[in-house]
Amino acid sequence: MMVPSFILWDVGSSVYTYGSLFIIALIIWHVRRSHRGLRLGPIKSCTKCFRRIKQKPSDRTLRVKKRTTKEETEKLQKLLSNMKRQGWLPQEGSVRRLLCSDPSCPICNAMALEIQQLLGVENKKTSSSLLRHSRSFSCLEALSPPKVLNDQSSELSKVLNGQSSELSKVLNGQSSELSKVLNDQSSELSKVLNDQSSELSSQHSKDISLPPKFMQSQSTDQKLTLSAPLSTGNTVLQCYHPAPQQQPEPQGSNAFQDVSGLSSSSMDEHGVPANQQKKRKKTKKLVSKNQAAPSEAEMENKMTFFSHWVNPEVKCDRPEESFAFYKSETGAKPKTGEPKKSSAKVRAEEPNLEKHAKDLKAKPLHAKRNI
């Protein structure tokens, strides 16, 4: 007991005992706690948080996929309905050619089958179509990643939209061209109709607006030719009356030839009736040209002049006008046709006629007749 190593035990035996007991208790508590943790696992609150952290990204991906599938199906249905209305549905082999050139590609084959099913279904409900789309998309997801499917669907939608826009442009261009052609044809027809109506109206106005003096002169000439008695004889009367002062001198020769034609026609009415009608028509035309607007006094003077020329025995209260009868060169033989005159003879007679017209203004002429 007197050994120095045992001095501490003797001095602080109480402190040593209490300290050793406290250390032993701590070791036991720690061992028990670790043993409980291995049995029960983590705490419930911690497990819930851990589960939420793990489940959030998976739920989001599923929800996004569902939304995308619904939106895509709705867009496809709208496009198909519009294409069916306007008749723009593609053929069976054209869709597969657009997708891929490799015939053994499983993704393109699946898409082509899906498109054929969509085009073939017309009268089924939307629920069945949605289920079919979901199944097809699930199969495609198993075969390929979702990015490839989204890219292919976007490309298909772009192609369909481009085709629809091109077809609408073509239809609009054709409709505008047809409208232009119809407008041009209608304008041409309206112009033709207006021209025809204007021509008809002008013709009608010309027919209505005939000069009354010309009509009166024609009626008086017809009365004279009908009322004048026929003279019998073998002589040919050539009459001449002076032209008015307003007309030029060459018209005197024309008047002389016209009156001579009238006298020969009146003398030969019994022989040639056909020639008589032709001569009457010629005289009417020449009288209307030479006398464009005759007055009433001139018409009365003509009446008296023609009555004296056809039959000199007819009497009238008016004073006698100056006229002359020339002997015919043919003698007493009657003429059966029109007297033929050469152009040289007519040219030689023109200066004599002008001189004779001047003399007639100064002195009255006497009528001569050869029986």
Swiss-Prot record:
Coiled-coil residue windows: 62-86
Pfam families: DUF4599
Cellular component per GO, a single term: membrane
Annotated Basic and acidic residues bias: 330-362
Spans annotated as Disordered: 189-222, 240-299, 326-371
Basic residues bias locations: 277-287
Domain of life assignment: Eukaryota
UniProt subcellular location: Membrane
Keywords: Coiled coil, Membrane, Phosphoprotein, Transmembrane, Transmembrane helix
Phosphoserine PTM positions: 197-198
TM segment ranges: 7-29
Compositionally biased intervals (Polar residues): 189-203, 244-266
Family from the record: Belongs to the SPATA31 family.
Name of the protein in its database record: Protein SPATA31F3
